[in-house]
Regions:
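Conserved glycine-rich cofactor-binding loop
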Residues: 3-4
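The beta1-alpha1 cofactor-binding region of Rossmann-like NAD(H)/NADP(H)-dependent oxidoreductases
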Residues: 28-29, 50-60, 92
Length: 192
């Protein structure tokens, strides 16, 4: 998601470096802010509403990008949720939501872009995971599992494409970053 935090900052930095950025998230108002900021700095942006839990949205996002600019060079999979809670609290709906966004979102967006990268025989897929994928903590069991899945998927995909394909896969595992991600914590005992 490009509407806040790491995704917002990444899109802005890429645009300042000269990249045309297709930006997606569920919150269109935040996307429009980013689109305006990119354009104010002389860059090009295409803001599109995107729900990464829907494969059709991911496919349409990539197709609209290709329609506008003719190609996709880089995919940054950044959408994520972190509604921390202890497993014993059985917030199963939150577990499903994290799996849908944090894992399926990466899979669906990657699936949408791979045919284009294979056709042009180059590209870069960047998956934003978390150090939590390697360092599990109480109340983060499910979140950590989703981030471990992103890390494992990234490594497998990197090996599948190998150096001969000219398609690179990078997994970034940031530590704690003060973003709106913290606002998705619903367990009151963990919000302080």
């Amino acid at each position: 998601g490009a509407s806040s935090g790491i995704g917002y900052a990444t899109a802005l930095a890429l645009s300042k470096a000269g990249a045309k950025v297709a930006i997606g998230a569920r919150r269109v108002d935040k996307l429009k802010q980013l689109e305006n900021e990119v354009k104010k700095n002389g860059g090009e942006a295409l803001a599109q509403k995107l729900d990464v839990t829907k494969k059709t949205d991911c496919d349409a996002f990539v197709e609209q990008t290709v329609k506008k600019w003719g190609t996709v060079d880089i995919l940054v999979n950044n959408a994520g949720l972190m509604p921390l809670s202890f497993v014993k609290n059985l917030k199963v709906d939150e577990w499903e939501q994290m799996i849908d966004v944090n894992i399926k979102g990466v899979l669906f967006c990657t699936a949408a872009v791979i045919p284009h990268l294979k056709e042009k025989k180059s590209g870069h897929i960047v998956n934003i995971s978390s150090v939590a994928g390697r360092l599990v903590f109480p109340s983060g069991s499910v979140y950590c599992a989703t981030k471990h899945a992103v890390t494992a998927f990234s490594e497998g995909l990197r090996q599948e494409f190998s150096a001969r394909s000219n398609i690179r896969v990078t997994c970034i595992e940031p530590g704690v970053v003060e973003t709106e991600l913290l606002n998705t914590i619903t367990d009151e005992s963990l919000q302080s």
